[in-house]
Amino acid sequence: MPLNIPLRKKILAGEPAAGGWLTLPSTAIARTIASTKNVSWVLIDGEHGLINESHFYDLANVIAASGASPLVRVPAEEVWLIKRALDSGAHGLMVPMANSAEIVRKVVQATKYPPHGIRGYGPMFTHATGQLGGSYKDSANEDLLIAVQIEHPNAVKEIEDIVKEDIDIAFIGPFDLAVSMGVEFGGVEHEAAISKILDACKKAGKVAAIFCLTGEQAAKRFAQGFDMVSVTTDIDTLTDGFAAALQAATGQSNAFTAAGSGYSL
């Protein structure tokens, strides 16, 4: 039987997929985000967030039970990290700094069971996908989503080759992209690189995705042609909401809250 992957259904229907970014290991926050109307996916951030592999299972199940797809971002393309993320029941995987087609091929290999890959067998805790054991294995190679992050000039240079690989989503990390390129965030060179990635995805029939911190940013990216966009993070929403209420109450702001979560450049 097919795995229950709402985000894949959304993508196949050609509908824009808005999602949230989870950096805190809280099932309550995960449930709140995932149960919000029109949220298609929630990224469990195991790279920069305060989340580690011991949190993956509970977070994935809470998100899936709320009707959204849990995706797990691992810190690197290590085979064991990918295996642990997928064995938690994640509907898809995100790997940062996929800076070459060679790295992407290794990611795909680690994600898929033999004969198409090298993933070890042990789907005992994949409840969030709706299947376990052999039923899970029979559909996992086809149904699980593979997202690689494009956030380095080397990846931009190789983007046409990267999107030829057996991935589903090319996900732009715009902050790391600007830093690694040594250019202004939102400047001409930065936006040109983003447009190049978007065009390559469209030509290859792959999902074009990008990280955004605000709904306004996300709306512009959807209008630009992106298929999948984050609208904000949990920590940004918490920080900005509290800071706004505090400023309204006191008439004062401070440097820390004015800076938001610290993610922005």
What are these regions (language model features)?
Residues M1-T23, A128-E142, S195-K196, K202-K203, ...:
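N-terminal amphipathic alpha-helix/helix-capping segment at the start of soluble metabolic enzymes
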Residues P16-L22, V42-I44, P70-R73, L93-V95, ...:
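Hydrophobic faces of well-ordered beta-strands that scaffold small-molecule active sites
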Residues A30-S35, E77-H91, V95, S100-R105, ...:
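Catalytic cores of alpha/beta
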Residues E53-V79, K83-D87, Q109-G117, D138-E142, ...:
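Alpha-helix-loop-beta-strand connector modules within alpha/beta enzyme cores
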Residues W80, G92-D166, P174, V179, ...:
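Conserved anion-binding
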Residues T233-T237, G241-L265:
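Extended, intrinsically disordered, low-complexity segments
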